[in-house]
Structures are given as C-alpha cells and as structure tokens.
Amino acid sequence: MVHFFRAALVAVAFVALALGSSAVPANADVVGSVRGTLTGTDQHPIGQATVTLTGDRTTLSTTTGTDGRFAFARVPFGHYALSAATPQGAASAGIDVASDATVTVALVATPVIGRTSASSTTVRGTPVAENAFSARRLAALPRNDKLDAIVEQVPGIVQFSYDEPVAHGFHGLTYELDGAPLPQSTSSNFGQLIDPRNAAAVEIFTGAFPAEFGGSRQGAVVNVVSGGTELTGGNGGALTLGAGEQGSDDARLIEHFTAGHAQFSLALNGSRTDRGLDSPMLVAQHDASSSTDQFLRIALPMGERDLLAFDLSNQYAAFQIPINTNPNDPNSPLVSVPGTDDVQQEYDRFASLSFTHTSKDGNGYVRVVPWMRWDRIAYDGDLDRDVQAFVVNGDGTTTPQNGLRQDRVASYAGLRLSAYRASDRHALKFGIDLQQENLRSSDLIQMAGSPDFIDDAAARGTQTGIYVEDKWTATQHISVNAGLRYDHSTGYVGGAQLSPRLEINDEIARDTVLHAYYGRLYAAPGLEDVRRDAVITQTSPTASPVYDLQPERDTYVELGLAHTFTSALRAYVNAFDRTAINVLDTTQLDNTPLFAVFNNAVGRVRGLEFRLDASSAHVDSGVSLTNSHAEAGGVSGGTFLFPPGSAGDITLQPEDHDQTWTGNAFYTRRFGPDLRTFATLQAEYGTGFPVQFENGDGRLPAHWIADVSVGRAADPVRKRLGYTLSVDNLFDHRYLVKVNNGFNTTQWNAPRRIVFRITAPW
C-alpha cells in the first residue's frame, strides 16, 4: 500500500508538470450552482454583460446570453457577492451557496443601486440545517485545530465522550473531502479523520439531506474543502510553531506553488500533548498523545472546462489510555494498577483522483472520482497489568478485569460517478457510489484464571448507492427538491432500502422561507462495527461466531423557518423528528474506552433548534441553541446475544448522550486598517447527560466553558509575522462528562490550556 501511494504521487506530479492548457479556477469539488437573469428596470434582458461571482477564495466570471441568462455550474459552498456592470447601471446581490443547492437570482441593473428581484434564500437548497465556516472564520476560532470542536458549533450536535459529535441524537457522521467520501465506522477511532488546519472551508448539514448522501450513519454530513486557512491564493508558504500548557507543542508547514498550469498545495502538521483523552481522574495520569499528518492536493486545469484534481493524505496518531489508580474514587469504580501502559496507535491513508467536465453553456457537468483509503487501529494493551485491574462494586466487593490487544486493518476502494444538468426551472442530478471494504482483525483477550481468547477474522463488504434528484423552481417563491436513493450493502450482514427524499421551500414573506423536509435513511454497519462482542464480553455460552448486528433504518422529518435580515445576517428555527429501527448504538468494549456497536430495537429523537449567523468585514458571530430528547429501547445485537426483533421490552428511555439543552456561541471582532488583528470569545453550555444508560434516572450537573483567542493573521504580501494566543477553558471549569456505568467510562473534561503560536509567511 505504501508503494501504491508513492507511485500514485509520482505519476500525478509528472502528469501535472507535463501538461499545459488555459487556466480555470481550481475549485474544490463540494459545490452548488448559481443561475439567473440580468435585466434592466424595464424588464428587458441585458445580453453580453459580464457577471462576476466573488467569494472568500473564489472569483468566477461569465457572460450573459442574448436572453440575459447566466449560469455558474460549479460553485464551492459559501457566501458570495454577485455583481454585473452594464450601460444601464450596476446590479449586485449577496447570496449563500450550499453543497448540492441551486440558487436562482434575478439581477436588475439600475442607475443607482443593484438589487435582486427575488431573494436568493428563496430557492436555496437548504435554507435551514446547513452552516458553513469560511477560512477567515476558521482561522479565528480558539479550537480550530479540532474538527470535532468546529462541527459542535452548529445546532443539533452534542459533544459526547472523547469529543465525539452526536448529531440529532444518533452516533455517526458522514465526512467528505473535496467531494470524495471518507468512510467511517460507528466504532470510531480517537484521531481526526481530517485535520481542520488543512481546510479552507467546512460545511455541516444536520438535516434536509439531499439524495446524494446516504448508505452509512448520517446524523450529519460534514463537507470539507482543502487548502488551509493561511493564504488567499497564489504561490507562497508559511511555518507555524506553537507551545503551551499541559506539554502542548505543535508545528505546521504549508507551501502553495504552481508548475505550468498545475496548482500544488502541501501541508505538514505535527502536535503532541500530555493531556490527550478525557481522563477518569480529575488530574490525568498516563494521558499523552501525539499526531502527525501530511496532505497534498494537485489541481490541474485541462482547458477552460475540464479539471483534474488529486488528493493524498497520510496520518498517524498515538494515544496513551488514561487510568484511575484511586480505589476510593466514587466517580470512577474501575481501578488500574500504577504503571499500566495501554496505548492505541492509529494509521490512516487516503487518495482520490477527480475529473470534472463542465458543459459549454455552464449549465451542467460530469464528475468521475475513484478513491482509496487504508486504516489501521492497533490497541496495545499492557496485559500483565490489565488483568490486575478491578471494578469496585456497590457492596464493596471487586470484580477482576480483562486485558485486550487488538489490531484491525480496513482497506477501502470506491468509485463515484455523477452528472448534473440545469434548465430554466429544473436542476437534475444523478449518480452512483460504489464501495468495497476488506477487513482484517486480530483480537487477544486475556482473562485472569481463564485461557486466552483469540479471535482472528477477515471479511469483505460492499456498499452501492444510486440516486436521482431534481431541484424544481416551481414559481418565483417556491422550490421543490425531490430525490430517490437506493442503497444496498453486503458484509457480515446485508440489506437494502429505497429512500425517498422531499424538500419544499416557500417564501411566505419577503426574505422569509418556510421549509419542510421528509426523508428515509439507510445505514449499513461497517465491517469494523460487527464483531464477536457476545463472546468477548463472556455473555455467550458458545464460542461460535455470532454476527447479528442489523442495518439502521430511519425516518427523518423537519419543519423550519428561515429569515434573511441582510446579506450578512440570517437566522432559522427548525423542528425535527427522527425515528429509527435497529439503531446503531455504542457501548464500551471490556474495560477499555473503545466503542463496540450494538442495536437498539427502536429509537427516537425530537427537538427544536435555533441558529443566528452574522458575517461582515469587522464581525463574525454565531449563536446555536438546541432543545432535544433522544430515547431508545430494546437493547440487542452485538454485545447482547439476541436479534433486535426478539427484544421483549422496547420501552423508550433516555439515551446516554441525551442532553436537554445545548448551546454554543462565538463572537469575533476584527481590528486595524487591514482587519488582520482579531479577538474571539467562544462559549459552550450543556445541561448534562444521564448518569446511567436507558434507565431514565439521574443527570450529571449542567456545565459550561469559555474559550478565547486573540491574534493577528500573517501577511504573506508584506512578509509580516502572524501570531495567535488561544485559551481553552478560560475559567478552568471542571466537570464530569460521563461516569462509569458499564456502557461508558468515567471522563473528566480538560483543564485550562494556554497556547501561543507564531506564523512566518513567505
């Protein structure tokens, strides 16, 4: 596999250097479309006029036809200024583009001021439940080195164990990098799937999922456009060095350059800390972690309408598993002997090659994306000491524990094909996703007084998704997004489902959109999720493999209202209801913090969420508030040796990640004539998780934290240094995230950490 990645890198670099053609913008491949008309105040079309679309890092231009129509088929998600200069005057509008959305705008040229005759929000693909973070916004956030911390800023998402984002009451998010899928199992690893320092923009869907997305756990969809936050384009690079409390230090090297018409973006990152995972003790023991990652993107324009792009990522992370050595701690009954040295190492490699052809009239495109991913998770348990660990029971007796060594390798290969075509009132997209996974797993369980349990397994699985969707602009004020998706999966278990999706957006008043959505979702468990837990946890009377984990099937409904106050200020409120059968849920594996997956026979989450988002030259801010109730019942499958259909008691009880109120807010203010100096205040609030699992009794106390960052962005033009001083958990507020209950380990949040970073550009 290493040789493959090296050979692919050399081949693509050679092709990029050898080919030459006219340049087009090297846009990433997570896009929507913009189309419209340009007219005068007399409603007559204006032809042969230049229309320009300008965003954070993208500038696109086109010319209107004789009928005044214009189109941009591939526009990366984000906020844009749309403008046109004509003999009759100027026309302009501010618009927001979401992935897979079609934005229709009617520009009217006037001698004094430009305006849109129809609000751009009117026909957005997702006027609610979609939020985007630009490079400028990301760079100013205090915890912008953690993708989970960014995702958890939006409504509907709760920060759970080990910073896992739980979206709308369910585990598992779908991640995409530059338009290519990044498969992830529900039993996720500790490391980051994508280093956010390599991101130029992040978009998060928590609802209104288009038919394009599906097949795996989909509490939310996270789209990432690569490029980094430091530079605004062109050639150049930067070196960032940082150090701070808790043994923290990090380094980042980036380089953007061109060779012929090819554009290269290279990033190298490394970091370490003495406080990695949430610890079972207030003062952490054995909790260091480190990570390195390398990312390369090559974009090669091949004419005015063709683009070839290549992504290559390599990551490594190592985590000491924190321990509790105090037998008298009532919050942490699992006790390890001093010196226990369990370690998890994680390796990840990813490569994708995308080819995009845009039609001559700008109203369509075709994309082909082959991709590969290799992932290895190795848990190296300190077996001799692990079997000396024990759990203190309520009556004062103790129960001895087991030791675990695990080495799991998953290899993925996939192909994504899609085609898009827009007309006056319709935007049709269809595609197919093919994925194959090969899993090799080796487990050793050492049990005091019993023979070792050894389980070596290998399996192959597939996922196939086929979809078609249409964005129909029914009237000037109503748009309908309808889609149909078919998913089929094989592996230890298999299944299939036909999933309709329907979304209606109605501008009921000027700049106010009523939104409704209905969708069916299908989630196949990854091969990594399906293991012999019943044997490993000694709940089965036989050593025969039992693979009874079933695919999850959801019905999701939402009703919302969005209002655009100005082009830089919008708000929405959204009510959601999600019901599921065979919920893919998680519990701890033995006495480790690793996740094992099981089924709940039924599950339901209901809630109401609010978002206020503002962005201007001087201020970036956002407020999110969610009230929700997540319940499940009928524990079965995986660890529990009976199929979901035979569960006797399916009374709904609060999930262990159920949190009644969750709030997030951030405020960034920019200063100085060049607006490069900034200060950000960020806050988080939660009312606490249940103490036990699905028993309905007891809650941990409410908690809150505040983070701060101040700094100045580096100036690559004048070659001036940049710096950032960030403070996580400003007031050093400590709280219990979870307590050990058989499904979760005890976890304390991290103490205050101050980190200073300096950036030298060139």
Predicted segment positions?
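Surface-exposed extracellular loop regions of Gram-negative outer-membrane beta-barrel proteins
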Residues: 318, 324-331, 440-445, 492, ...
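Gram-negative outer-membrane beta-barrel transporters
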Residues: 475, 575-579, 598-690
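Membrane-embedded beta-barrel scaffold of Gram-negative outer-membrane proteins
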Residues: 262, 365-383, 507, 515, ...
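Extracytoplasmic beta-strand/coil segments of soluble accessory domains associated
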Residues: 146-184, 207
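Transmembrane beta-barrel wall of Gram-negative outer-membrane proteins
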Residues: 243-272, 282-322, 343-365, 422-424
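A beta-strand signature from Gram-negative outer-membrane beta-barrel systems
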Residues: 153-154, 194-238
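Short, acidic, small-residue-rich periplasmic hinge/interaction motif at the N-terminus
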Residues: 39-41, 50-54, 83-88, 98-140, ...
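C-terminal beta-signal and adjacent terminal beta-strands/loops
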Residues: 4, 684-690, 712-762
